[in-house]
Amino acid sequence: MTLRNPHLGIDNDELMRRVEALINASKNRYRITVQVANRAKRRRYDDPNDVEEGWMKPIRRAIIEMSDELTEPEIIGDE
């Protein structure tokens, strides 16, 4: 049984499924790990006063965003 904290957005099981999907979709595990870390780092330093989503750690946010881009390519597609 996984306890879900309403401030985390998704539970740990869902987060792990998203991580596995990212790794499986990538040809290189190291590269996808570095990409996620770089996105989290960039997001953290781009807007350090982000109060709206300040309760979510940057690494969790980066995983969620990148997995959404993987499963829903129209998010990043050109219109």
Curated annotation (Swiss-Prot):
Gene Ontology cellular-component annotations:
DNA-directed RNA polymerase complex
For this chain's UniProt record, which GO biological process terms are given?
DNA-templated transcription
Q: Pfam families given for it? A: RNA_pol_Rpb6
Keyword Glycosyltransferase set for record: no
The EC number(s) given in the record are 2.7.7.6
Q: Does the keyword Mitochondrion apply?
A: no
Q: Which UniProt keywords apply?
A: DNA-directed RNA polymerase, Nucleotidyltransferase, Transcription, Transferase
What SUPFAM superfamilies does the database record attribute to this sequence? RPB6/omega subunit-like
User: Which GO molecular function, any one, fits this protein according to its record?
Assistant: DNA binding
Which InterPro entries does its entry note? DNA-dir_RNA_pol_omega, Pol_omega/Rpo6/RPB6, RPB6/omega-like_sf
The protein's annotated catalytic reaction(s) are: RNA(n) + a ribonucleoside 5'-triphosphate = RNA(n+1) + diphosphate
- What HAMAP family does its record include? RNApol_bact_RpoZ
What family is it from? Belongs to the RNA polymerase subunit omega family.
What does this protein's UniProt record list under function? Answer: Promotes RNA polymerase assembly. Latches the N- and C-terminal regions of the beta' subunit thereby facilitating its interaction with the beta and alpha subunits.
Q: How does it assemble?
A: In cyanobacteria the RNAP catalytic core is composed of 2 alpha, 1 beta, 1 beta', 1 gamma and 1 omega subunit. When a sigma factor is associated with the core the holoenzyme is formed, which can initiate transcription.
This chain belongs to which protein, by name?
Answer: DNA-directed RNA polymerase subunit omega
Organism in which the protein naturally occurs:
Synechococcus sp. (strain JA-3-3Ab)
Give the encoding gene's name. Answer: rpoZ
